């Protein structure tokens, strides 16, 4: 089956003018640049590198296509952004498509030591159970306070990944330089990395590069909106396919049931026919005896 890529089937998710208005094109000062970003730089202006937005449009579509496919398969994408201007955007966008996210400090080993992180999340769940089943009532005031503080800390750092029961299938990072530990862990485990990459960052360890301003909230918002829309559509497609599959299964069951009914009717007809034949045989036998 020939599959067209997502971004070819649909119009581009963004356009040059919208990205320009959102200041996606503003890079860092030329003296802070990373030469590996040269292919994505259009020019320099007043000592600042200007990103080629035509390339950004294409790269957003490529990332959107890949994320659409991941979401369609029912896999999880972990969003990471601990810088102030990106936190709220990431939390809002990731939550809208029921994806996990990290906006507080990245705990070393979040991916490479995932089993330990899961234990911490389970600890949080255990505390919640204690609170609900009345176990808390048997503790001293001091113990209650200690556990409550522990629960608060766990919620702050890990609450947004509480539903992540296995390693994510992809990582989406805002500011790959700031989140270099997360990128390194994903690289080590072979988890594909999607990232907004500014002119001062190294794109070499990023699988899906989106060249753009990773400091301005407007820039972060427009890029995130585009990729999250694609994820949402992937999830919608998955839901539709599941519903269709369930409908087909239900139809198959009904057909089998109907066939079984028809078979029973035939067996009934055969029994009646056999009884008539047997009656004739008996009648003939009686005549012969007479």
Label the model's feature ranges.
Residues 1-13, 233-290:
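Intrinsically disordered, compositionally biased charged tails
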Residues 7-243:
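Ribosome large-subunit tunnel/peptidyl-transferase-proximal elements
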């Amino acid at each position: 089956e020939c599959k067209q890529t997502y971004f070819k089937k649909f119009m581009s998710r963004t356009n040059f003018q919208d990205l320009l208005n959102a200041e996606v094109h503003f890079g860092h000062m030329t003296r802070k640049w990373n030469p590996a970003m040269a292919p994505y730089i259009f020019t320099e202006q007043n000592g600042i590198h200007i990103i080629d937005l035509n390339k950004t449009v294409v790269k957003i579509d490529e990332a959107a296509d890949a994320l659409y496919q991941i979401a369609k398969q029912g896999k999880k994408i972990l969003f990471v952004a601990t810088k102030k201007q990106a936190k709220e955007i990431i939390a809002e966008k990731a939550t809208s498509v029921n994806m996990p996210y990290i906006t507080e400090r990245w705990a070393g080993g979040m991916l490479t030591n995932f089993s330990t992180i899961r234990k911490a999340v389970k600890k949080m769940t255990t505390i919640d159970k204690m609170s609900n089943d009345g176990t808390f009532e048997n503790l001293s005031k001091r113990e209650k306070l200690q556990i409550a503080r522990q629960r608060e800390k766990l919620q702050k750092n890990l609450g947004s990944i509480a539903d992540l029961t296995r390693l994510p299938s992809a990582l989406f990072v805002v500011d790959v330089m700031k989140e270099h530990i997360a990128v390194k862990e994903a690289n080590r485990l072979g988890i594909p990395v999607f990232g907004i990459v500014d002119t001062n960052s190294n794109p070499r360890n990023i699988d899906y590069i989106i060249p753009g301003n990773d400091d301005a909230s407007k820039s972060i918002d427009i890029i995130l909106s585009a990729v999250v829309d694609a994820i949402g559509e992937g999830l919608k497609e998955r839901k539709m396919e599941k519903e269709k599959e369930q409908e087909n299964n239900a139809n198959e069951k009904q057909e089998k049931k109907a066939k079984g009914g028809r078979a029973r009717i035939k067996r009934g007809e055969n029994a009646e026919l056999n009884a008539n034949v047997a009656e004739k045989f008996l009648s003939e036998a009686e005549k012969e005896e007479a």
